[in-house]
């Protein structure tokens, strides 16, 4: 049975009068008759303005690590509200939260706060340039690092002829200065030889290597530990700052993030999504000698940085993640969900694999998991694209684009989300098979 989006569709027409695309982020626009407007969220569930209830596996693209409207975090945020909000001065709480982050992430010797992942990566890139005196940077193909000009580029490999050299670099958006193109270089994930060749040719210009070891906007495709350690050595060899973007993986895949899982330390690292369980806060952290450049030539700031509400929420969220078994609960649920999905798919002879970590896993309809963005691009993802809307009608909300992982929160494990999800998944798979037959 198709759910009704009548009220969402009506509101969308009204919203178009004041908001481009009717929304406040391009990624929230799903089409004229498919864009959803939310009434409220609680735990691992959302309710839209039509009254449809969803088990949510987007979780705001990852921030909801504990669940929506978590009483523990919201009570702390309320106390933060009573502090007063924005002072353009500092509070003792900043030191306390920074100390917690340094405890959980050894690479985070010094910490600075911002409000979004984009801001954190901007700061990291500025620090890397200041530290090395080199302006260019490397981005891993398929990686996502926010919506600022320096990183809104991609390697156009769809029509690329490898015999003609490196793939052309194109802008993701209009309005980006073309002069910035010469500062962006790209490398495929899990190919250390390619990375080394790129550095041999351009190391005199490259000051930063930006990497998501688990690509949060590309099916959670994951770097091998061997690749990460090889990249670490190459960065040291060629005087390149290794920036590990943990905006999505940080405080989710492990207390110490993906760096803990793979046993290495970044020069600089960024965090955002899970830090405050949905309250706006982000982090740039790293080696003391690099971070000390802030105030010694490098500018970093922001009026709303360390708002008392967000900082209080972060303090409580990180306390829960550090001192309880919340992350293990999340991982166990994600593993059980994937096992249940596998049973359903195997019973129907559907080749598949899961990528990444159970807390933010990608579903890939091929028996061989992708090792980089090129593998995903060469795959047939039409089955996923057909399945996702069927799941939405059955009350399970995943991203319509297969590149976005399934995000798990602690609250999913506290109700009957798992059996409900698997029942809906089985129905959606059968409907998709009939549709594509």
PLM region descriptions:
Residues 1-437:
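Conserved N-terminal phosphate-binding loop of PLP-dependent enzymes in the Aspartate aminotransferase
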């Amino acid at each position: 049975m198709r759910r009704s989006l009548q009220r969402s569709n009506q509101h969308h027409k009204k919203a178009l009068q004041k908001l481009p695309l009717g929304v406040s982020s391009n990624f929230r626009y799903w089409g004229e008759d498919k864009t959803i407007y939310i009434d409220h969220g609680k735990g691992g569930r959302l309710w839209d303005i039509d009254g449809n209830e969803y088990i949510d596996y987007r979780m705001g693209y990852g921030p909801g690590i504990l669940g929506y409207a978590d009483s523990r975090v919201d009570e702390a945020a309320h106390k933060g509200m009573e502090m007063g909000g924005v002072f353009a001065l500092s509070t003792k709480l900043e030191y306390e939260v920074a100390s917690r982050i340094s405890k959980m992430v050894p690479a985070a010797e010094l910490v600075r706060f911002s409000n979004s992942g984009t801001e954190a990566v901007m700061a990291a890139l500025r620090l890397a340039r200041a530290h090395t005196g080199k302006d260019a940077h490397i981005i891993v193909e398929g990686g996502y690092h926010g919506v600022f000009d320096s990183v809104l580029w991609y390697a156009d490999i769809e029509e690329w002829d490898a015999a003609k050299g490196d793939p052309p670099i194109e802008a993701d958006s209009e309005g980006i200065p073309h002069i910035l193109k010469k500062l962006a270089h790209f490398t495929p994930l899990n190919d250390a030889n390619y990375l080394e060749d790129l550095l041999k040719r351009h190391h005199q210009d490259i000051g930063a290597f930006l990497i998501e070891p688990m690509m949060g906007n590309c099916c959670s495709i994951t770097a091998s530990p061997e690749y990460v350690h090889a990249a670490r050595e190459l960065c040291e060899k060629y005087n390149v700052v290794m920036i590990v973007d943990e905006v999505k993986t940080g405080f989710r895949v492990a207390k110490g993030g993906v760096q803990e899982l793979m046993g290495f330390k970044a020069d600089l690292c960024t965090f955002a999504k899970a830090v405050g369980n949905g309250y706006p806060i982000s982090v740039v952290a790293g080696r003391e000698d690099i971070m000390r450049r802030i105030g010694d030539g490098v500018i970093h700031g922001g009026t709303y940085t360390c708002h008392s509400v967000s900082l209080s929420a972060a303090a409580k969220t990180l306390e829960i993640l550090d001192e309880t078994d919340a992350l293990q609960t999340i991982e166990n649920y994600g593993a059980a969900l994937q096992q249940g999905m596998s049973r359903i798919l195997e019973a129907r002879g559907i080749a598949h694999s899961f990528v990444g970590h159970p807390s933010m896993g990608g579903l890939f309809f091929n028996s061989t998991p992708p090792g980089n963005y090129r593998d995903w691009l060469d795959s047939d993802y039409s089955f996923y694209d057909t399945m996702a809307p069927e799941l939405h009608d059955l009350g399970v909300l995943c991203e319509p684009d297969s590149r976005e992982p399934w995000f798990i929160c602690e609250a999913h494990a506290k109700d009957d989300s798992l059996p409900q999800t698997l029942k809906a998944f089985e129905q959606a798979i059968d409907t998709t098979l009939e549709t594509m037959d």
